[in-house]
Amino acid sequence: MGSYETELNLRATELRLGLPGSDEPQEKRPCSGSVVRSSNKRSSPELEESRCKSNINSDSSDSTTTSDHNEDSVQPAKVQVVGWPPIRSFRKNSLQQKKVEQGDGTGMYLKVSMAGAPYLRKIDLKVYKSYPELLKALQNLFKCTFGEYSEREGYNGSEYAPTYEDKDGDWMLVGDVPWNMFVSSCKRLRIIKGSEAKGLGCL
């Protein structure tokens, strides 16, 4: 029997995995990534399974960390688009109007015009605390004089008379309402001639 196997040379024609020219068959590795230790003792199946799991977990964690790092390095920074989200025009206008009304408490500037003057001036109404202070400032600003104001006659007899436009769009004489009410309702000022002031207030 031995001579028959030798004659046929079955060992030479045997199929096996391995590099060409190597006579020893390659040992079957228990799992990828595990280190084969030369030992006469055979390890238990539970120990081999735990080693395989630990190697797989370490490989997967390394690959996950690498992929996360690559994603962080490649991902561009998010830039907020200007004008997004869109706001309706009426809502935008109301928001801007609220900001203007709230303001920063610095001042309340009003336009002042004078009959015959080709220019306008601006004054801060919050600077003044009473009518006399305001009238004095207007006289110095436009180099004019006002007569004394009375509830019955207004500025009767003076060359010029200061008037203001209220919230309703009506033109009234400066001094016909209490100061606080005037400050809250005044939109702009205009100095007119005394003759043109008839029909306003008491004139």
Swiss-Prot record:
A motif (EAR-like (transcriptional repression)) lies at residues 15-19. Residues 58-67 have a biased composition (Low complexity). Residues 15-77 are annotated as: Disordered. Keywords: Auxin signaling pathway, Nucleus, Repressor, Transcription, Transcription regulation. One of its GO terms (biological process) is auxin-activated signaling pathway. Homodimers and heterodimers. This is Auxin-induced protein 22E. It comes from Vigna radiata var. radiata. The gene is AUX22E.
